[in-house]
Amino acid sequence: MNSSTDPTSDETIWDLSPYIKIFKDGRVERLHNSPYVPPSLNDPETGVSWKDVPISSQVSARVYIPKISDHEKLPIFVYVHGAGFCLESAFRSFFHTFVKHFVAETKVIGVSIEYRLAPEHLLPAAYEDCWEALQWVASHVGLDNSGLKTAIDKDPWIINYGDFDRLYLAGDSPGANIVHNTLIRAGKEKLKGGVKILGAILYYPYFIIPTSTKLSDDFEYNYTCYWKLAYPNAPGGMNNPMINPIAENAPDLAGYGCSRLLVTLVSMISTTPDETKDINAVYIEALEKSGWKGELEVADFDADYFELFTLETEMGKNMFRRLASFIKHE
């Protein structure tokens, strides 16, 4: 029955225009997704090549390699895209373009994870997918080309050129939230082959933490709704430790499974002033007081979140260079 005869079919549970609508009848309408970009070799703009690799029936990744010399070993950069747990893709231009340029600038093997999206696949699906993808990357350690004959699920770029002593994990917004939860898990569970995460980047991390500063009604609605959409039955709701890292039952931040961490903050979100400064300040203070033994860097930019991905402004280029310098350890 269509909407002309059944008016209830157009009733929404969530109307987050201009991005996504979720209807009571179960339909999901994604109003904004950037164009799909196919795999390519020797990109004329950057010299980077990329391909899409299945990891399991539910998870895949886009793997990137820059122009390099034979036998050169490169850091491995695993990226988790943001966009509300429910939009975009590793294969679409918005995040793909960023990763492509980042791979060219930093000379890394890039692995951009294609995880399942809410609301079709509610959390913790994305958390599990990204852990599975990270374990897949780690499973390449110690292999050589001879291993490819018996391991059809392995990627030769990672085997031949990946330096597992320089494994980095990064994400933006909800992707940074996934990275945070992955770091917690990596501190408790071993990656395959004993691989360790050297460093991680949280770009505008998505946390919900009560603070003394009240968010405006509109900002609070738009900020918190993506968690409610992605994990409507989360134990504890917005006090679930996966979204509130200082909740009473949250894992100890001292257990982060990496040696270096860069937290990057911005002042604007799509030209709207960001109101999460206090949230991230509480998180950073909690991490500093936790006893975590790693090296923490904080970069606070008077810039819009989107500037990093468009690279159309000098500030966007400055943010890009700051993230790149962390990977280069400059």
Swiss-Prot record:
Disruption phenotype: Reduced accumulation of catharanthine, increased biosynthesis of vindoline, but normal levels of ajmalicine. Belongs to the 'GDXG' lipolytic enzyme family. GO terms for biological process: alkaloid biosynthetic process; indole alkaloid metabolic process. Changing Y204F: Strongly reduced activity. This is Catharanthine synthase. Optimum pH is 9.5. Keywords: Alkaloid metabolism, Cytoplasm, Isomerase, Nucleus. It is an enzyme of class 5 (isomerase). Catharanthine binds at G84, Y305. The keyword Aminoacyl-tRNA synthetase does not apply. Expressed in leaf epidermis. The active site is at S173, D274, Y305. Changing Y79F: Abolished activity. It is found in: Cytoplasm, Cytosol; Nucleus. Component of iboga and aspidosperma monoterpenoid indole alkaloids (MIAs, e.g. tabersonine and catharanthine) biosynthesis pathway from 19E-geissoschizine, psychoactive compounds likely to be used in the treatment of opioid dependence. Catalyzes the conversion of dehydrosecodine to catharanthine. A motif (Involved in the stabilization of the negatively charged intermediate by the formation of the oxyanion hole) lies at residues 81-83. GO terms for cellular component: cytosol; nucleus. Changing Y305F: Normal activity. InterPro entries: AB_hydrolase_3, AB_hydrolase_fold, Carboxylest/Gibb_receptor. Pathway: Alkaloid biosynthesis.
